Amino acid sequence: MKGMILLISCLMLIEVVVECKEGYPLDTLNGCKVGCFFGTNSWCNDKCKSKTAAKGYCAWPSCYCYGFTDDSKIWDLKKNKC
């Protein structure tokens, strides 16, 4: 039992240490967020994966992605004005 608790604790620590970028994928055509509607989670997931993220979902009105690589371009409020 103690071993199981130790294993779970180690896995949680690794997840905290190895965090990846997350945010809104950048639409390269207009520099805005990639838009979506409710219920289009699979579409956003595919769009996020095409933008080098691990997964994504529709956070209406835009897709939100997790697990971007460090060199991925994501939407930034300070730089992008859409």
Curated annotation (Swiss-Prot):
Disulfide bonds join C32-C82, C36-C58, C44-C63, C48-C65. Residues 1-20 form the signal peptide. Expressed by the venom gland. One of its GO terms (molecular function) is sodium channel inhibitor activity. One of its GO terms (cellular component) is extracellular region. The keyword Ribonucleoprotein does not apply. Has the structural arrangement of an alpha-helix connected to antiparallel beta-sheets by disulfide bonds (CS-alpha/beta). Belongs to the long (4 C-C) scorpion toxin superfamily. Sodium channel inhibitor family. Beta subfamily. The keyword tRNA processing does not apply. InterPro entries: LCN-type_CS_alpha_beta_dom (IPR044062), Scorpion_toxin-like_sf (IPR036574), Scorpion_toxinL (IPR018218), Scorpion_toxinL/defensin (IPR002061). It is found in: Secreted. It comes from Tityus pachyurus. Keywords: Disulfide bond, Ion channel impairing toxin, Neurotoxin, Secreted, Signal, Toxin, Voltage-gated sodium channel impairing toxin. This is Toxin Tpa7.
